[in-house]
C-alpha cells in the first residue's frame, strides 16, 4: 500500500465439513494443513477512499491451486459489475468504475498438488493513475 487511497486484503479459508454436515470456513495460516481435494476460498477486500475508474486487481494463485470456475467473463456481485479473466497462475478482475467504500469478492479453488507453496499476493492498481496501487500480504501453505 502506498498512500492509503486504495487498499486490498487477501484472506484464504478452507471449507471444512463439521459433524452434522454443516460446512464452515476456517482461516488458513502458516500452520494449517491442507489436503489434496480441499476447497479453498479466496476472499479479497478492497477499500477505496475515493471513487476510481478503470481499476485492475490481480490475485496470484499458489501452484498447488486450480480454480473451480475456469471460464472468464463478465460478473455481477455485491452491486458492482466487473470482468474476470482466469489465467494459469492468477485471476484478474477489471472494474470500469468503483465508488468510495469497501467491496468483498470471493471465489473458490481446489488443492491439486502436495508440497509447500506460497499462496500468492493480490495487487490492485488504477490503470490510468498508477500512483494509486496497493498489494496484500501472502501466506505459505503446506499440502499433505
Model-flagged regions — what are they?
Residues 1-144:
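C-terminal segments of large proteins
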Amino acid at each position: 500500500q502506498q498512500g492509503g487511497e486504495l487498499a486490498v486484503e487477501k484472506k484464504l479459508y478452507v471449507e471444512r465439513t463439521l459433524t452434522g454436515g454443516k460446512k464452515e470456513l476456517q482461516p488458513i495460516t502458516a500452520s494449517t494443513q491442507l489436503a489434496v481435494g480441499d476447497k479453498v476460498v479466496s476472499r479479497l477486500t478492497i477499500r477505496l477512499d475515493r471513487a476510481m475508474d478503470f481499476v485492475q486487481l490481480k490475485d496470484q494463485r499458489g501452484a498447488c491451486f486450480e480454480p473451480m470456475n475456469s471460464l472468464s467473463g463478465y460478473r455481477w456481485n455485491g452491486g458492482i459489475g466487473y470482468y474476470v479473466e482466469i489465467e494459469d497462475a492468477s485471476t484478474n478482475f477489471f472494474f470500469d468504475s468503483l465508488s468510495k467504500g469497501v467491496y468483498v469478492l470471493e471465489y473458490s479453488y481446489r488443492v491439486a498438488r502436495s508440497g509447500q507453496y506460497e499462496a500468492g499476493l493480490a495487487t490492485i492498481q488504477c490503470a490510468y493513475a498508477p500512483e494509486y496501487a496497493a498489494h496484500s500480504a501472502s501466506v505459505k501453505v503446506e499440502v499433505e
